Amino acid sequence: MGQKVCAHGFRVGPTLIKGWDSVLYAEKHYKTLFIQDLKIRDLINKGFNQAQVSRVLIERPSNKSIIININAKKPNIIIGRNGSEIDKIKKAIEKMTSLKEVYINIHEVRKFNIDAAIVAQTIALQLEKRVSFRKAMKTAIQASFKQGGQGIRVSCSGRLGGAEIARTEWYIEGRMPLHTLRADIDYSTAEAITTYGIIGVKVWIYKGEYTENKRYN
């Protein structure tokens, strides 16, 4: 079953190595807050796709405040000139949530070659620029090992190279223990919109086994 379940969701839990992307407590308003979280993520991911956002962690410590932590490869794009872009995001979120206390923290992802979300987005951007899918996949694999990755699997699906019939091609190097719960495996997907149609990209990156100090918040 290791190949049929999301590697991230499979490891989410208080005793496992992955944490939730939304931290809140709501008895009756869970549905409303959940939809708000989806809209906030959509606003950030689509509005700043050039920043290559890796993760958006939303915390609601009380009914009056919200804390948004954004991990991105290029945080300067999100910050904007003199913080102009952050102010726009804050105003949009204040209007969306009706909250006056909106806090946004932006973190730079330094080891972006072993971040599955950023790697998938990078491959998708290259495919949109008509770079060969094989070259894009192999380049990502080589870069991952240089930054400490112990295993990587990359998959591309669609009309690869403009072929008439859609197909899936993938490369794998190193270890990929999908069944091992203590294995720190990062997984993400991305879409490349090309003239031939949409090409789906999937990336799995194995970073080593779980240790107490490596656990995500």
Curated annotation (Swiss-Prot):
Coiled coil: none annotated. Signal peptide: none annotated. GO terms for biological process: translation. Keywords: Ribonucleoprotein, Ribosomal protein, RNA-binding, rRNA-binding. Disulfide bonds: none annotated. Part of the 30S ribosomal subunit. Forms a tight complex with proteins S10 and S14. This is Small ribosomal subunit protein uS3. It comes from Rickettsia felis (strain ATCC VR-1525 / URRWXCal2). The gene is rpsC.
